[in-house]
Amino acid sequence: MVTTYLLFIVAYLLGSIPFALVVGKIGYGIDIREHGSGNLGGTNTFRTLGKKAGFTVTIADILKGTLATSLPMVFGLDIHPLWFGLAAVLGHVYPIFAKFRGGKAVATSAGVLLCYSPVVFAILAVVFFTLLFTTRYVSLSSMVTAVVAVIASIVTGDKIFIIAMCLLAGMVIYKHRANIGRIINKTEPKANFSKKQK
């Protein structure tokens, strides 16, 4: 029981590592929270610091979810891995190491799925990138993909999977509420794939 509680804390702390903040400060001498949207996530890093930093942060944020979800399997605990994944996402959104101002749950949630259901992860990746290249809205692509994740979980019939995806989708949409307003007002920035970045 003690091990279980400790691993939940570890999962949360893993999620709390603010890679966008670390990469910005160490690699560029910039506090990412003071630039762009102020969000500690991959999208703001891409827009503020360029492709190299953006990919680094996104991959690191994905791995947080993957590692946290794998904890019960690594330590042989008979507890559903998605609970640990949720703890990591909570840490990413409300990180103790960054005054509880974190990201929008997308990349770390993807990491949770990568560990728990690689097939669903692959399907959602196709959905996300298809939407992204069609609409060029990262936020809209993220929210729609989150809804598709819920549908995919329902198809599996896995009750805990369904609950977890509903919670994650709810978190993603909640964290993007400002983006929804900007999309409606047509002021939401679009991804510019032709723009030369660092």
Curated annotation (Swiss-Prot):
GO molecular function terms attached to this record: acyl-phosphate glycerol-3-phosphate acyltransferase activity
Membrane topology: Multi-pass membrane protein
InterPro entries: G3P_acylTferase_PlsY
Entry's transmembrane regions: 4-24, 71-91, 113-133, 147-167
One GO-annotated biological process of the protein: phospholipid biosynthetic process
Catalytic reactions of this protein: an acyl phosphate + sn-glycerol 3-phosphate = a 1-acyl-sn-glycero-3-phosphate + phosphate
Keywords, sorted A to Z: Cell membrane, Lipid biosynthesis, Lipid metabolism, Membrane, Phospholipid biosynthesis, Phospholipid metabolism, Transferase, Transmembrane, Transmembrane helix
Intrachain S-S bonds: none
PANTHER family on file: GLYCEROL-3-PHOSPHATE ACYLTRANSFERASE-RELATED, INNER MEMBRANE PROTEIN YGIH
Family of this protein: Belongs to the PlsY family.
Subunit note: Probably interacts with PlsX.
Record-given protein name: Glycerol-3-phosphate acyltransferase 3
Species in which this protein is naturally found: Bacillus anthracis
